[in-house]
């Protein structure tokens, strides 16, 4: 029997609280339930492949929140982060990818699917698995892409703003694309 590589496996064992997926342990909010019920007549319709209305709405919402335009061309939607990670590596075809350890297995899965070489940046238990110099040192000029979760999955560590800015600037200088996964933010 193959072990599940993704969280949310409520079928093979009983789980009280599952922190491996970004589900709501309190259940569906009442407003979401009402919206779902209002849309029930459309359940048999195939969704808009371009996600046009969703893209327009989110672009507008983010633009208002940030006080500057967030173009709809900057947005990409999928059926979960794992699908998007696969799409990213297949579109970019990175030769070398850095993945902090521990991290979400979906990064490694995507990197292997694209035949990328993986360079693991092992985070230290002594620093509560917070990235630091060891991650910066792993991000050398031969690296094409960094997968980074903030907060980290599975540790839950949230990066400090100053460190994140330093890391992003370092990657910009090295020409490294950063895939910043904020699914749990």
Residue map of PLM features:
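N-terminal "arm"/small-domain region of PLP-dependent enzymes with the aminotransferase-like
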Residues: 1-46, 57
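Short linear sequence motifs
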Residues: 4, 39, 97-100, 177
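Residue-level marker for buried hydrophobic side chains located in beta-strands
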Residues: 19, 178-179
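Electropositive phosphate-/nucleotide-binding environments in soluble metabolic enzymes
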Residues: 26, 30, 52, 177
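Conserved core of the PLP fold type I
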Residues: 44-172, 179, 184-185
